Amino acid sequence: MTAQSKNYRKAASAIDRDRLYAPLEAVRLAKAGASTKFDSTVEVAFRLGVDPRKADQMVRGTVNLPHGTGKTARVLVFAVGERAEQARAAGADEVGGDELIEKVAGGYVDFDAAVATPDLMGKVGRLGRVLGPRGLMPNPRTGTVTMDVAKAVEEIKGGKIDFRVDKHANLHVVVGKASFDETALVENYASVLDEVLRLKPSSSKGRYIVKATLSTTMGPGIPLDASKTRNLTGEDAA
């Protein structure tokens, strides 16, 4: 048995599959079972009671994690002229117009988020085959199609992330790193949960959050009690 599988089995043995854990409890279990070889990413996964095939039940949005993701995002900006200079000044990793569009069309995707000015979306829109499946296509709804490219870059670098339910009604969102303290992870999770709840489609009937699970990279899933939305870090939170 490999060391990795031993660590997984040990972490999994500490989880009671017949109960739902309060967020603080789940975070403690996740941190305790995280790999010591690298700083694991901590992620929450929701199974939603929606039908993503219906346009009015597509859950998509953005959230500003109060403690960031633990990773400095690489941001690419499609802009020219003054807006391009503003993007560079704000810390964008790559900025450009036609040449950058051609580079991405050729398969270049070494970035975590893309921003575009509205005037270039006619050309950027043709990159759907490359950007769409990776969730990287700029979109007005997530604030990534904008003339204020500097603000968009700063927000993404500061911990703003976007999320979108997949075709199986699953939603995966990063809430930080295992090295974060408990409070930071719980507060990041709370921000994600609040936004997911706010985005509940009016046409979605019945149970909205069917299942919620917290996990680390290569770690076991920990069943979450998503009904807990208040006092998540207080003395009686666990």
From Swiss-Prot:
One of its GO terms (biological process) is regulation of translation. Gene3D superfamilies: 3.30.190.20, 3.40.50.790. InterPro entries: Ribosom_uL1_bac-type, Ribosomal_uL1, Ribosomal_uL1-like, Ribosomal_uL1/biogenesis, Ribosomal_uL1_3-a/b-sand, Ribosomal_uL1_CS. Pfam families: Ribosomal_L1 (PF00687). PROSITE patterns: RIBOSOMAL_L1. Keywords: Repressor, Ribonucleoprotein, Ribosomal protein, RNA-binding, rRNA-binding, Translation regulation, tRNA-binding. GO terms for cellular component: large ribosomal subunit. GO terms for molecular function: rRNA binding; structural constituent of ribosome; tRNA binding. PANTHER family: 54S RIBOSOMAL PROTEIN L1, MITOCHONDRIAL, LARGE RIBOSOMAL SUBUNIT PROTEIN UL1M. Part of the 50S ribosomal subunit. Belongs to the universal ribosomal protein uL1 family. Binds directly to 23S rRNA. The L1 stalk is quite mobile in the ribosome, and is involved in E site tRNA release. Protein L1 is also a translational repressor protein, it controls the translation of the L11 operon by binding to its mRNA. This is Large ribosomal subunit protein uL1. It comes from Beutenbergia cavernae (strain ATCC BAA-8 / DSM 12333 / CCUG 43141 / JCM 11478 / NBRC 16432 / NCIMB 13614 / HKI 0122).
